[in-house]
Amino acid sequence: ILGDRPDLRELHGLPYIYCAAPRRAAGLIAHALVGNPTRRQSIIGITGTNGKTSTAFLTQQILALSRGACANFGTLGYDLGGTWVDAPHTTPFGEDLAALFLEVEKRACSHVVMEVSSHALDQERVAGIAYNVAAFTNLTQDHLDYHLDMETYLRAKLKLFEKVAEELRSENKHGPCFGVVNAED
């Protein structure tokens, strides 16, 4: 068991491994175990208070017409390149995401568009994903029950751009990387 309690050595009779950021570690491990499929795909992450779903669907349609099969993970469900799966979360946890990316790779989807919630960014559910594009739709007063103030909320959203910057600095960079910000709102 991987967790953030340094006082434990075992839990329920199983070995307990302390980790300061267990969700991040679990995501990195899960992606590594399935061969890091996002290193071979173009990953477009879309964040913002409103407009993520519409932007994701429009982007998916453009990519499908110009590049072929394209997956879409978001609020309404997960399109695995023609097969729909119900979505328990807008952005699933790292272990589930790794399995989804592997599945869409098997289905010959070279591009994946995904909504990336501020909760997922804050909770490091997207650790291990090699993003090529970060898109930001807008920021309005929502989810302040979780983030407490607008500054903290914005910092969570900007983590998606930090992930693209990580990819830009990576020795294993796999395609162009850039950010898109909606300046109209």
PLM features: residue spans?
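Conserved lysine of the Walker
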Residues: 52
